[in-house]
């Protein structure tokens, strides 16, 4: 009975093994072989007496060689649809070349030989045209603005004014340059955010009032008499009891002139002389027109304030610094003048200070020469020297500065006329 069962089981087992694939059978054989090798190695080590470590190492080498030979065998059957064979380097290189060729071919569009190629029409970007148009408009506006600035300067003929001042005002080159810089910047356009307030300060006889008269004459010639006001305190408001009347007159003249100038798009010029004797109430009226919280037409005006205030400070500064040939009037001088002006009234806080310094003797000679030519007299050099020697001078560092400036030149020349 038992023999029959074993006989029946043996064919069944044999049939199951036959169903397994060839790799399974190879693994079974390799496992059996490993077991027999282990047993034989152990028996050999026991008989020969070699150490177990060397036996184990040799056994590992044998197993690795058996595994390598197992994978190298051709017992694996090549499947029809899929396998796990690792590709060689040659196959990989060949496949990459084929793929590259396919990609290169796919990029080109093939057209039939008898068909005309119709390439897509390239559409031009409109943004580029808009950008060019915008740049052209901006350039035109800039060019137009520059032309308008030139037109304004030509309208007031500031170049001619500068030449006149340089020709007829002696010894005040720095003051004239500063004055013209302010006028050119302000009169270049008609719209401003504040009025231009200039203050001529210096000792007597240095050319402040003479410069004011030249400015009034020039602007009357280029604009009209209706847009230029010359106001002398000693002449227009000599009596302190008439201050209220003077206030009304000054306020009315300024308002009326500004209104007319705004209609014709012109900038009026107001010249106030002898401010050192002007009443405080009248200074308050002027200060009201210098404020920023006014209508726009009152912001387009030029105010020139002429006074001897700060003249002593300028005289001391020039005499103390006579050895220095400074190109520009230092800020220290303007600070000294402004300190003296603030003691008089606070309206000078918004003014641009233009200091007029002392005149040297050579400038006095120029004044005599110019006056002689005006009167039609022969300009004898020795006669001019004698006339200039009659004036008083400050002497400092081999330089002579006139105490009274050119103020007595006209009177001295008039004394010559009966004898010529």
From Swiss-Prot:
List UniProt keywords, sorted A-Z: ATP-binding, Membrane, Nucleotide-binding, Transmembrane, Transmembrane helix
Offer one Pfam family short name for this entry: Torsin
Q: What is its main location?
A: membrane
How does the entry describe its membrane topology? Single-pass membrane protein
Q: Which compartment or compartments is the protein found in?
A: Membrane
* Family annotation (Gene3D superfamilies): P-loop containing nucleotide triphosphate hydrolases (3.40.50.300)
Q: Which residues bind ATP?
A: 202-209
Instruction: List, alphabetically, the InterPro entries matched.
Output: ClpA/B (IPR001270), P-loop_NTPase (IPR027417), TOR1A_C (IPR049337), Torsin (IPR010448)
Q: Which GO molecular function terms does the record list? A: ATP binding; ATP hydrolysis activity
User: GO terms for CC?
Assistant: cytoplasm; endomembrane system; intracellular membrane-bounded organelle; membrane
Residue ranges of the TM segments: 130-150
The similarity comment for this entry is: Belongs to the ClpA/ClpB family. Torsin subfamily.
**Family annotation (PANTHER family):** TORSIN (PTHR10760), TORSIN-4A (PTHR10760:SF1)
- Protein name per Swiss-Prot or TrEMBL: Torsin-4A
At the highest ranks, the source species' classification is: Eukaryota, Metazoa, Chordata, Craniata, Vertebrata
């Amino acid at each position: 009975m038992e023999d029959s069962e074993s006989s029946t089981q043996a064919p069944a087992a044999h049939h199951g093994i036959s169903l397994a694939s060839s790799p399974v059978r190879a693994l079974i054989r390799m496992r059996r072989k490993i077991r027999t090798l282990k047993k034989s190695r152990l028996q050999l080590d026991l008989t020969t007496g070699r150490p177990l470590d060397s036996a184990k190492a040799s056994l590992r080498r044998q197993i690795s060689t058996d595994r390598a030979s197992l994978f190298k065998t051709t017992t694996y059957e090549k499947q029809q649809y899929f396998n796990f064979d690792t590709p060689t380097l040659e196959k990989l290189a060949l496949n990459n070349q084929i793929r590259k060729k396919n990609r290169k071919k796919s990029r080109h569009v093939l057209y039939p030989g008898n068909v005309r190629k119709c390439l897509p029409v390239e559409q031009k970007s409109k943004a580029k045209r808009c950008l060019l148009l915008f740049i052209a408009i901006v350039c035109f506006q800039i060019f137009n603005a520059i032309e308008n600035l030139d037109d304004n300067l030509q309208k007031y003929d500031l170049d001619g004014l500068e030449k006149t001042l340089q020709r007829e005002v002696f010894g005040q080159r720095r003051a004239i340059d500063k004055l013209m810089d302010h006028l050119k910047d302000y009169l270049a356009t008609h719209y401003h955010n504040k009025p231009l307030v200039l203050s001529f300060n210096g000792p007597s006889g240095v050319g402040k009032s003479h410069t004011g008269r030249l400015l009034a004459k020039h602007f009357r010639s280029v604009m009209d008499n209706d847009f230029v006001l010359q106001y002398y305190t000693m002449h227009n408001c000599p009596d302190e009891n008439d201050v209220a009347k003077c206030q009304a007159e000054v306020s009315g003249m300024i308002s009326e002139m500004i209104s007319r100038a705004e209609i014709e798009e012109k900038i009026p010029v107001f010249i106030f002389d002898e401010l050192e004797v002007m009443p405080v109430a009248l200074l308050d009226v002027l200060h009201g027109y210098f404020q920023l919280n006014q209508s726009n037409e009152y912001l387009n005006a030029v105010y020139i304030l002429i006074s001897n205030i700060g003249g002593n400070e300028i005289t001391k500064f020039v005499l103390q610094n006579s050895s220095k040939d400074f190109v520009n009037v230092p800020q220290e001088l303007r600070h000294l003048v402004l300190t003296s002006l603030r003691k008089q009234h606070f309206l000078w806080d918004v003014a641009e200070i233009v200091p007029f310094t002392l005149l040297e003797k050579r400038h006095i000679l120029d004044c005599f020469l110019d006056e002689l030519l005006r009167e039609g007299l022969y300009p004898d050099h020795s006669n001019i020297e004698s006339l200039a020697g009659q004036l008083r001078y400050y002497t400092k560092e081999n330089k002579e500065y006139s105490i009274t400036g050119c103020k007595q030149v006209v009177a001295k020349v008039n004394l010559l006329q009966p004898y010529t």
